[in-house]
Swiss-Prot record:
UniProt superkingdom: Eukaryota
Cofactor(s) this protein cannot do without: Ni cation
Gene from which this protein is expressed: ure1
Record GO terms (molecular function): nickel cation binding; urease activity
Pfam families assigned: Amidohydro_1, Urease_alpha, Urease_beta, Urease_gamma
Free-text description of this protein's post-translational modifications in UniProt: Carboxylation allows a single lysine to coordinate two nickel ions.
Assembly behavior: Homohexamer.
PANTHER family membership: UREASE
Catalytic activity: urea + 2 H2O + H(+) = hydrogencarbonate + 2 NH4(+)
Protein name from the UniProt record: Urease
Binding residues for Ni(2+) 1: 407, 409, 490, 633
Organism: Aspergillus fumigatus (strain ATCC MYA-4609 / CBS 101355 / FGSC A1100 / Af293) (Neosartorya fumigata)
Binding of substrate, residues: 492
Record lineage: Eukaryota, Fungi, Dikarya, Ascomycota, Pezizomycotina
GO BP of this protein: urea catabolic process
Family stated for the protein in its record: In the C-terminal section; belongs to the metallo-dependent hydrolases superfamily. Urease alpha subunit family.
């Protein structure tokens, strides 16, 4: 067949395109991926037919699917589609703008080449206009109404008459020093000294040959130093240099047409203002604007904007981040950022706000206003953009900290790609691959296996911490594992979570400052939950799947959320409670824990762990902030690529059933609830595991492990994932494409994934002090966990509630502070079939 990679890549389009045709033919409304694949696949077939031009196909692509054939969200998200194929004249790009542009489309064209029967017209419902209201669209932005934003507020302005005597068009950008513009522009250059156009940052004014325009100029800000351009007026703005500058203009042949001194006060010249909606489209939402998170019922309101109106950073042709404009000149790399993320909406436990994010040496070096302090207002001294700075456009994007999954069974290395594609950048757990022990427990036992697993994970583009086996009432083996590099210890009932083992394990954790995680005794063999809690002796411990379906004292392990030394987490199969939750769990549990349906006691053990009442209560306790963390239990009763989306589905369900939180009442937004839920998979696991000094939040001094989202796909599929400020995974098109947006657009590993030092190997301090980990030949950055033992529930951000718990041992009814914790199972959730093909 002699195929090459670009041909194999296109097979994804054909496979999914034909799948989408089959679904369409049986009356299923298509989601974004299906609709994009169907149109792309048909275009490829029409290209192969050889009868159509690029222009023909650009038109045909808009006629295949109508609004009735796709889910309402697709009309908003599928605004452009690009394919490349081999025409009789070679490879060319076909761009289809607004592919869903009619109600009815053309099913004959949509099912082209499939030989499938065309379904009756009444198979698909008539589009309901209410489904397409702006506020119902995924990632909707609702700017503050009836307000305008003033650009470059408080600065001096002038008006100048400008005539173009050139024979070609001249376009001048917002931040180009106006005195330095094309010599064929005729105007009073001395009056323009120290000024630039008073227009939105990154826009421009175009002068066609012979044009005469009156433009408004505004003073440059910052240090007021001119650099770059034509080097006519370089240096600090100083009117005493006027004669010198005039002579240079004359020598260099720049047209200068003096104007009479203005009679009106420059303060009377109105500044440029922008409609809030137009501003949001260009630079992203700003203070007071509302943003919907995906298709959930959650809305955030921007709390503040650290950028400066009129001096925003914008990269591209004619934009602001150019030499001598938004990019400063004559500065060393030591003074400038390595990378800047511009105009990002940050969603973090620390706030929900708009800012530029500065990255240097793999760390978040500053958050605020970036740019060129020589001509821009409010530039943070640690956020200078220079010729050594790269740019990631964050406008109309959301940036969060990389997610942290603290419950990983290292069953297969391919988990990393799934997790990265969902926004997870840190794994903590144990195992040795698909061994029987690892299929059930997160333990890497013994120093040999510990070393081998640490070495095996060295090339994975994700932060990793390996947990040892803590089930040993004698401490010698546990100490060996810690000294071999264990970042924590796991107690699991399948290895025997007895009070004696718990006591010894916690002693060793206290001695070496590592965290203890526990899966308690479902059998109640050594005692009930009270005996296990007693064995903790008020020492800090992280309780896994605290509800109990994932394992733990039946039926009341959930009661441990009341204790100040317990750091409770959930695993995601029970998140949130739905009509299907109970039915999937029995078989899941039997496989995971090596049980047999032929042994009645095994079946009874499994059934004792699956209780609708406690799963429903888990929903409520998350919303109260009593369960502090979310994790997966990867391939061992959990899904490593769904920690984040199930967190937000839980938040959505709780808002739908329980209403706004008290803290959010009257705000018109859900900021408090959003901070509570994002903390569950970012900052709180980082605090619990002794890693929050470097990861877990979007804060200065932390590793630049960041996830960039389109608001419309928030919580499901990130646009890009950064590790130490370097892109490790991104939605990326055909590598042979003329541009990076050619279908199929797939989450793919990027260059950062091949730089091991962008990720951390978390180990114990003892393993570093003994020089053991250094002998492993690792390329990853080695860091010790710390401050694991003197923390408690009080340290869990937005999730520190400790209600007095009661669980009825017969009915399983759960009460918190005397209030019934009950929730109905969801019949549908937002972050599901609109986003995923399977």
């Amino acid at each position: 067949m002699h195929l090459i990679p670009k041909e194999l890549d296109k097979l994804v389009i054909s496979q999914l395109g034909f799948l989408a045709q089959r679904r369409l033919a049986r009356g299923v409304r298509l989601n974004h991926a299906e609709a994009a694949a169907l149109i792309s696949s048909n275009l490829q077939e029409l290209i192969r037919d050889g009868h159509y031009s690029v222009a023909d196909l650009m038109s045909i692509g808009k006629t295949m699917l109508g609004r009735r054939h796709v889910l309402p969200s697709v009309v908003h998200t599928l605004v452009e589609l690009q394919v490349e194929g081999t025409f009789p004249t070679g490879t060319y790009l076909v761009t289809v703008h607004h592919p869903i542009s009619s109600d009815d489309g053309d099913l004959e064209k949509a099912l082209y080449g499939s030989f499938l029967p065309i379904p009756p017209a009444d198979t698909f419902p008539d589009p309901n206009p209410d489904d397409y209201l702006p506020e119902k669209m995924p990632g909707a932005v609702l700017p503050v109404k009836n307000e305008r934003i003033t650009l470059n507020d408080g600065r001096k302005r002038i008006r100048l008459k400008v005539m173009s005597k050139g024979d070609r068009p001249i376009q001048v950008g917002s931040h180009y020093h106006f005195i330095e513009t094309n010599p064929q522009l005729h105007f009073d250059r001395l009056r323009a000294y120290g000024y630039r156009l008073d227009i939105p940052a990154g826009t421009s004014v175009r002068f066609e040959p012979g044009d005469t325009k009156t433009v408004t100029l505004v003073e440059i800000a910052g240090n007021r130093i001119i650099k770059g351009g034509n080097s006519i007026a370089s240096g600090k703005v100083d009117i005493s240099r006027a004669e010198e500058i005039l002579q240079r203009l004359q020598v260099e042949g720049f047209a200068h047409v003096p104007e009479p001194a203005p009679t009106a006060d420059s303060a009377l010249i109105a500044p440029f203002t922008m409609d809030r909606e137009a501003y949001a489209r260009m630079f992203g939402p700003t203070t007071g604007d509302l943003v919907r998170l995906g298709l959930t019922n959650l809305w955030v309101r921007v709390e503040k904007d650290c950028t400066v109106y009129g001096d925003e950073c914008a990269f591209g042709g004619g934009k602001t981040l150019r030499e001598g404009m938004g990019q400063s000149s004559e500065r060393s790399a030591t003074e400038c950022l390595d990378t800047v993320i511009t105009n990002a909406l940050i969603i973090d436990w620390s706030g929900i706000y708009k800012a530029d994010i500065g990255i240097k040496n793999g760390l978040i070096s500053a958050i605020g206003k970036a740019g060129n302090p020589d001509m821009m207002d409010g530039v943070h001294p640690d956020m200078i953009v220079g010729s050594s700075t790269d740019v990631i456009a964050g406008e109309n994007k959301i940036v969060t900290a990389g997610g942290f999954d603290t419950h990983i069974h290292f069953i297969c290395p391919q988990q990393v790609d799934e997790a990265l594609a969902s926004g997870i950048t840190t794994f903590l757990g144990g195992g040795t691959g698909p061994s029987t022990g690892t299929n059930a427990t997160t333990c890497t036992p013994g120093p040999t296996l510990m070393r081998q697993m640490i070495q095996a994970c060295d090339g994975l583009p994700i932060n990793v911490g390996i947990t040892g086996k803590g089930n040993d009432s004698g401490g010698k083996s546990i100490e060996e594992q810690i000294r071999a590099g264990a970042a924590g210890l796991k107690l699991h009932e399948d290895w025997g979570s007895t009070p004696a083992a718990i006591d010894t394990c916690l002693d060793m954790c206290d001695k070496f400052d590592v965290q203890c995680m526990i899966h308690t005794d479902t059998l109640n063999e050594s005692g009930f939950v009270e005996q296990t809690v007693k064995s903790f002796k008020n020492r800090t411990i992280h309780t896994y799947h605290t509800e109990g379906a994932g394992g733990g004292h039946a039926p009341d392990i959930i009661s441990v959320v009341e204790h100040p030394n317990v750091l409770p987490s959930s695993t995601n199969p029970t998140r949130p409670f739905t009509m299907n939750t109970l039915d999937e769990h029995l078989d899941m549990l039997m496989v995971c824990h090596h049980l047999s349906k032929n042994i009645p006691e095994d079946v009874a053990f499994a059934e004792s762990r699956i209780r609708a009442e406690t799963i429903a209560a888990e929903d409520v306790l998350h919303d109260l902030g009593a369960i502090s963390m979310m994790s997966s239990d990867s391939q061992a009763m959990g899904r490593c690529g769904e920690v984040i989306l199930r967190t937000w589905n839980t938040a959505h369900k709780n808002k739908a059933q329980r209403g706004p939180l008290k803290e959010d009442e009257g705000t018109g937004a859900d900021n408090f609830r959003v901070k509570r839920y994002i903390s569950k998979y970012t900052i709180n696991p980082a605090i619990a595991q002794g890693m929050s000094h470097l990861i877990g939040s979007v804060e200065v001094g932390k590793l630049a492990d960041l996830v960039i989202w389109h608001p419309s796909t928030f919580g499901t599929k990130p646009a890009q994932v950064l590790k130490s400020g370097m892109i490790v995974a991104s939605q990326m098109g055909d590598p042979n494409g003329s541009i990076p947006t050619i279908e199929p657009v797939v989450m793919r590993r990027q260059f950062g994934a091949f730089v091991p030092s962008t990720s951390i190997m978390w180990v114990s301090q003892a393993s570093i002090d003994d020089g053991i980990v250094q002998s492993y030949g690792l390329k990853k950055r080695i860091e010790a966990v710390r401050n694991c033992r003197n923390i408690g529930k009080k340290d869990m951000k937005f999730n520190d509630v400790m209600p007095k718990m009661r669980v009825d041992p017969e009915s399983y009814v759960v009460e918190a502070d005397g209030v019934l914790c009950d929730a109905e199972p969801a019949e549908a959730l937002p972050l599901t079939q609109d986003y995923f093909v399977y």
